[in-house]
Regions:
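N-terminal glycine-rich flavin-associated loop
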Residues: 94-113, 139
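A short, Trp-centered hydrophobic/proline-enriched beta-strand micro-motif
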Residues: 125-133
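A structural signal for short hydrophobic beta-strand segments in well-ordered beta-sheet cores
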Residues: 147-150
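A short core secondary-structure module
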Residues: 155, 159-205
């Protein structure tokens, strides 16, 4: 098996390396090699700005189709990007749920209208998403979800609580798994709803850690 890189792949690595050198400057220098799990001293706001900087360079969702705003990188190029990123001690990434979870879900199962509405703002860094799966009494067991959604007229009305919604305080949208069938149990009767965070009835509270932080 040949593990040598092609000329195109070497050029790709150089493009990534050069871009990182040119953009990890100014306030982003303080994030170099930081921002990973356990680095509580790194401000999330600055990490979000770094995500937007990556978006300007076209480095968010590099595996997404070009037609929707991605780079359509091959699997090898994706690996090379992350390898080069780590070698450059580039800033630790936020849990970008739009890029890693919602975007791929919409590309696989969403309508063309949903894809064109939601995916480009994710890849441009203009809209940040959080995840609405886990619940206080269910943990991450989605078969035990209690949050309910009822269709009233042309609007869905949600009632419930979600936890571990990382970066909810900064998010523009949340994708929520809720029960839309009245007497459903376990995995049946669940729906996947896209919900704006800025609306009446949505409240966000921090989770107090054992350290008090």
């Amino acid at each position: 098996m040949d593990f040598t890189y092609s000329i195109t792949e070497k050029e790709f690595v150089e493009e990534v390396r050069t871009w990182l050198e040119e953009h990890i400057v100014g306030e982003f220098v303080s994030l170099r090699g930081k921002g990973l799990t356990g680095h509580d001293d790194v401000p999330a706001e600055l990490q979000i700005e770094w995500e937007k900087e990556l978006a300007k360079g076209g480095w968010l969702g590099i595996d997404f189709p070009k037609s929707i705003g991605g780079r359509e990188c091959s699997l090898v190029e994706q690996v090379l990007f992350h390898k080069t990123y780590v070698e450059a001690l580039a800033p630790g990434r936020i849990p970008n749920m739009g890029v890693t979870l919602l975007g791929p879900t919409l590309m696989a199962y969403g309508t063309k209208e949903q894809q064109s509405r939601f995916v480009p703002p994710i890849l441009s860094g203009d809209e940040l998403w959080c995840q609405g799966y886990s619940e206080p009494d269910a943990g991450s067991d989605l078969s035990n979800v209690h949050t309910k959604a009822e269709l009233q007229g042309d609007e869905w009305v949600l009632n419930g609580q979600k936890v571990w919604t990382s970066l909810a305080q900064f998010a523009d949208w949340i994708f929520v798994v809720a029960r839309t069938s009245k007497d459903s149990k376990r995995h049946s009767g669940l729906s996947y709803l896209l919900v704006p965070m800025e609306q009446p009835g949505v409240s966000i509270r921090p989770i107090i850690q054992i350290t008090g932080g």
